[in-house]
Amino acid sequence: MPGDHAGAGAAVGAAKAMQLKVLMPSSFHKMRISDELAADLLGERGDGGGGGGGAPRRAARVVSPVGKVWDVEVGRDDDGDGGGAFLGRGWAEFAAAHGLGMGWFVVVRHEGGGVLTVKLFDTTCCLWDFGARPAVVTTRSGRARDASNKPQFLRVLLPGFMEKMRIPAKFVQHYIAEEHLNIHMASILSPLGKFWRIELEKDELGMFFKGGWLQFLSFHGISPGDVVLLRHEGNLVFKIKVFGINGCKKDLKTKDDITIQQSARNQHETPSFSTRKCNKNSRFGEDCKNQLQEIPCSIKGSRKKGRETKRPKKSKSIYEIGPPSWIKKEISNYMLENGNISLPGIFCKSIGLVEETTITLMINSSRGRSSSSSSRSWEVACSVNKNGYGCCNLLPSGWKRFCQANGLLVGDVCTFSVVEATLWHVAIDRVERS
């Protein structure tokens, strides 16, 4: 039975569990839920809400999108082995009152204290608008006072959606402002707190996430069959949640992700696009507390026995994955003589460098004290190692010309600031010349 929304106000505590469900015929009478969600609701995770003997039963308070609260039974099938968990008595009435249909998606979240909030997505994969949400104003730019009611859509990641993913036509029509339809770049805020720039493609079939989308999925361990839920924050900025094949929310914080996040927090220097001088006695990167050191990608040498193969020394890279994304490299003898510079795979993958391409390096040159400036650019070939690490290399075709034109010497430090995957601004910190 529905009740007053204020009745749920006493529930406190952070969200404990989330689950996504697709409504099947059996879901309208009794909706199955995950063991994790059931354990929270039934007090089996140490919150003191567990029952006594027999199969545990407990009523959850389900808050509908229109602000009403429904009492719904939570229980397990009594089959002698714990049984499957479900939302039972009261759920059928909730489903009927909200007009839920076959193939709809339901996202439930436990807010604590037995209170469940519900989001409903119809067969267009867009958040269902009941038109009666209290105290919420939502605009085409996606701004809303209540974050849960901002425009949202979800997609099941079928194999064809890994390379590029179509944004639902209904979502584009209702929630993408007209002035944004000709913008070719969106931003996604990952669960790790980093913004990723994703290229937008538009054709007669609609609007798609494309350039950088596959790299975003790969970096976060998002796989075919997962479901992505994107919430529009406005101005083509999206927040994302991911659910696994079992419907449970995925934790995307891998070991590598945490390392990168910690590295980014320790970077206090924002690179500029000017050429500066540095003390020749100072060591590269000593102004940065967290230096990342990588082994350069292997350079194929002669296989003839007894012939020495010349290999680069280990070089230090300090980088941040953004935006803005940037990486610093100290110029070595090897880079100048062999015309090859190696960049770490994690950095390359994060900006979308996953295949052979050409990168434009650009330097801005200011003219004296005036505000006028000019820019020069060089095209440099880039290869990507297919050895699993994804290291990329700026090749002699273009890199040597760049070094010669800018008079680079051993000890100089180049900061490459990524504007787009294949367009980088370069700032040069020159070692003092004797």
Curated annotation (Swiss-Prot):
It is found in: Nucleus. PROSITE patterns: B3. InterPro entries: B3_DNA-bd, DNA-bd_pseudobarrel_sf, REM_fam. It comes from the Eukaryota. One of its GO terms (cellular component) is nucleus. CDD domains: B3_DNA. Coiled coil: none annotated. One of its GO terms (molecular function) is DNA binding. The keyword Oxidoreductase does not apply. SMART domains: B3 (SM01019). It holds the Pfam family B3. Keywords: DNA-binding, Nucleus, Repeat, Transcription, Transcription regulation. Gene3D superfamilies: DNA-binding pseudobarrel domain. The keyword Transcription regulation applies. Residues 27-124, 150-246, 326-432 bind DNA. This is Putative B3 domain-containing protein Os04g0347400. It comes from Oryza sativa subsp. japonica (Rice).
